[in-house]
A protein has these predicted regions:
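An acidic-aromatic loop/edge-strand motif
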Residues: 24, 28-31, 36-39, 52, ...
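Aromatic-lined ligand-binding clefts that engage carbohydrates, nucleic acids, or primary amines
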Residues: 52, 79, 84-115, 163-167
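Carbohydrate-binding surface patches
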Residues: 75, 223, 630, 636-639, ...
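Aromatic-lined carbohydrate-binding/catalytic grooves of carbohydrate-active enzymes
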Residues: 125, 389, 397, 411-524
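Strand-loop-strand motifs at the edges of beta-sheets in extracellular beta-sandwich domains
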Residues: 257-261, 340-356
Length: 758
């Protein structure tokens, strides 16, 4: 869990561009100086920083040569703020200092005075302290904007000013890193909020409906202008909607609502919202994209989905719910079950224990009034488990440390009520926040057994309720003394904790490096391995199979040795966020680890960031566009990545369900061959990834990383694909006929098409 919780500086708008013809700015992305360590005197304008090193602020300090450095560091820059900046502004009352994103915590000083902390303005005469780094929330992905009255005496107009930035980094990348730092005056356009996703779009009567709010956030200015909305099909360019409203007047704190309705799209569409200010001569433009459904409606007749192989170790509890879609009620049958297993014919849940090793071929059947479906299921009883990537839900990306038992139970029931478990979704995993906080006592009982906090009064009962639904139960800890969120972890209590997990019915353990980095400051490869060996040995001694998820962000090329320490999956990077930049960097970076994925061992590029996420009590719709979400799910499935839903399942909408219940896409992830797709083509903004499948066919995705729709012709042989095969569009579950030597596709910006070639 990179940097614990990060607090999202989230706005309900996407791709905002404010344009003011005469607005001037001072670029701050050059001439910064840097030093490691901490001394509050560094904030003083007269401090001699001649011995400091120059540093770029468009990359973390690790990328600038300060590898593996965590803790305090300072940045300083000297800049003349010209009076004409104020004189030429439409509004002349406030100066804005934007420092981009800072990893993790910051205090910002102007001419020796503290003006801001972690993205919030500091009251005048605030005394700096060290509490700014003591919270459980990191701000590494939040932009830092600080403002002062233009009449503030701390600003030296037409003179040299010193900006000093005190940074504290927990771990991983640190410092200022976005390269877009600047000083500007606040404009009237900064007070207009175009809230286009405050209420998620809805599909009704074969139409898509959206509500847009215009809001004046100022306390003293009236906003006047013209508001226009335009929607086009991103593939064809067809105009889907066009409207202009003139003579809009928004008084301070006033808002107005606009409704948009278009025919339910079956392709990507772009909506542009534009507000033209009458007096300021500026505009605000916001763009977003409409969700569109590609997954066909499930049939009423039975269909068996999910993995065709499952595994357990000899004499360990076995649990498998037959994943079948179709109308209920439904009955189930399993032919040739191994000795020790039993099927509940009404629920489709298989339980028991098998003592003898073997590969057991079982015919599973599902029946309702519309028909019968059957498929072979291989039950592997042996030394290896987790033969297909885990599919489930994890509490972190939505609830963070605000998770509680009620939220977990609700999520488990939604698996059943929304039909997720009918498509193979299995695990219900609690992340950080179930333990006693590190600053409270007692953390353990007199015998050293870990204690749960008041949010989880009965973990065994919770596990039993999850198992009763045919689902599996996961939990979280760290090899250090504390978890990333500052809760009690497993250091020097590994065997006790493993026994506790087993007694609660735990099926999955995420084991997060976190505070173990304070024990091993500069770990060697053997030190990277050590804590995972210790917990692996503890888990093996229990009477349950517990999937072992290593979470240490890819350090030491974990994919090369994760299997050796007993890992079934291992994180390959830091935490993902719901941004295109994060998705692109993490997802398309899974290249060098490709050879190491196989049944029982999976590269984990982190959880899914579709639906409503938020890393705490305040949630928002993902910032990924619909096309980016299609890319997200497609790439993860091609990569044979673990699929862990990270959103609030109680807010599942039709579009997100469409992403999570396409059985032909999920089948790529759950293919028993366990092959991770290879990147075979990089052609400008186009990438092609190809995956070998167990039936001898190949699946491939054509991804467009560019900003515009791409019309692309793929030479099949150059991509390692055989011409003349049967082509199938997997998202639309539609046969496309035989191929020639190439195929031509239109791929929307940040989007994908996924095919199977047989």
């Amino acid at each position: 869990m990179k940097n614990l919780l990060y607090l999202l500086a989230f706005m309900l708008t996407i791709s905002i561009q404010a344009q003011t013809p005469k607005e001037e700015s001072i670029n701050l992305n050059q001439n910064w100086k840097f030093i490691q360590g901490d001394n509050i005197d560094y904030a003083k304008p007269g401090f001699d920083d001649s011995g400091w090193k120059a540093i770029k602020t468009n990359k973390t300090w690790e990328e600038s040569g300060y590898e593996k450095y965590d803790g305090y560091a300072w940045y300083r820059i000297k800049v003349i703020i010209p009076l004409k900046l104020k004189q030429s502004a439409f509004l002349k009352d406030s100066l804005r200092i934007y420092l981009g994103k800072i990893d993790d915590f910051d205090q910002v000083f102007l001419n020796g005075s503290l003006i801001g902390v972690n993205g919030k303005n500091a009251p005048d005469r605030t005394v700096p302290d060290t509490l700014f780094k003591s919270g459980t929330q990191s701000f590494w992905d939040a932009g830092r904007t600080y403002s002062l009255s233009a009449n503030d005496p701390r600003i030296k107009w037409d003179q040299e000013n010193v900006i000093a930035v005190r940074v504290f980094d927990w771990n991983g990348g640190g410092g200022m890193y976005t390269g877009d730092q600047a000083i500007t005056m606040i404009n009237i356009s900064d007070y207009l909020a175009i809230e286009n996703n405050k209420v998620p779009p809805k599909f009704e009567d074969n139409n898509l409906k959206k509500t847009i709010d215009l809001r004046n956030t100022s306390s003293g200015y009236t906003i006047e202008g013209v508001f226009s909305i335009n929607a086009i099909n991103k593939i064809t360019g067809e105009v889907l909607y066009k409207n202009e409203t003139k003579n809009i007047e928004l008084k301070p704190q006033q808002s107005k609502t606009f409704d948009l309705e278009i025919k339910k799209p079956d392709q990507s569409a772009l909506i542009t919202y534009r507000f033209d200010f009458l007096k300021a001569g500026s505009t605000v433009t916001v763009t977003d994209e409409t969700p569109y459904i590609t997954t066909p409606v499930s049939l009423a007749s039975p269909r068996i989905n999910g993995a065709s192989v499952t595994a357990a170790r000899p004499s360990k509890p076995f649990l498998f719910a037959i994943p079948a879609s179709g109308d209920r009620p439904m009955t189930f049958e399993a032919v040739n079950l191994p000795k020790g297993l039993n099927l509940d014919k009404n629920t489709g849940i298989i339980t028991g224990k098998v003592d003898l090793k073997g590969e057991y071929k079982v015919t599973i059947k599902a029946k309702n009034t519309k028909g019968v479906a059957s498929r072979e299921l291989t039950i592997s009883i042996g030394d290896r488990i987790c033969l297909t990537p885990p599919m489930g839900w994890n509490s972190w990306n939505c609830w963070g440390l605000a998770v509680d038992a009620q939220k977990v139970v609700a999520s488990a029931h939604i698996y059943r009520d929304k039909g997720l478990m009918n498509h193979g979704w299995t695990y219900v995993n609690i992340d950080d926040g179930w333990e006693i906080r590190g600053d409270l006592n007692p953390k353990r009982d007199p015998k050293g057994n870990i204690i749960t906090n008041e949010k989880f009064p009965d973990m065994k009962r919770l596990g039993d309720s999850i198992h009763a639904l045919g689902l599996k139960f996961g939990i979280y800890s760290s090899p250090g003394p504390l978890t990333c969120g500052g809760y009690t972890a497993s250091y020097q209590h590994e065997e006790q904790d493993a026994r506790s997990y087993a007694s609660w019915g735990i099926d999955y353990l995420k084991y997060d490096w976190c505070s173990y980095g304070n024990i091993v400051k500069d770990p060697t490869l053997q030190e990277y391995k050590k804590p995972y060996f210790v917990m692996r040995n503890a888990l093996i001694k229990t009477d349950r199979d517990i999937v072992f998820s290593l979470c240490q962000y890819g350090m030491g090329d974990v994919w090369k040795w994760g299997d050796e320490v007993g890992g079934n999956l291992w994180r390959t990077t830091g935490d993902i966020t719901d941004t295109w930049e994060s998705l692109r960097e993490i997802g398309f970076g899974q290249v060098k680890n490709q050879p190491f994925a196989k049944p029982g061992n999976w590269n984990d590029p982190d959880m899914l960031v579709v639906g409503w996420v938020g890393w705490g009590p305040s949630l928002h719709p993902t910032r990924l566009t619909p096309d980016e979400q299609y890319t997200h799910i497609s790439l993860w499935c091609l990569l044979s990545a673990p699929l862990l839903i990270g959103c609030d399942l109680q807010r599942l909408d039709e579009f997100t369900l469409n992403l999570l219940t396409n059985d032909e896409i999920i089948a790529l992830d759950q293919d028993p061959l366990g092959n991770q797709a290879k990147q075979v083509v990089v052609d400008g903004d186009i990438q092609v990834w190809v995956k070998d499948l167990a039936d001898g066919s190949k699946a491939f995705g054509v991804f467009n990383l560019g900003k515009e729709t791409a019309n692309y012709t793929l030479n099949l042989e150059k991509a390692g694909l055989k011409p003349g095969g049967e082509l199938r569009d997997l998202w639309r579950q539609k046969s496309m006929g035989k191929t020639g030597n190439s195929i031509s596709v239109a791929v929307p910006s940040h989007g994908v098409v996924v095919y199977k070639l047989k």
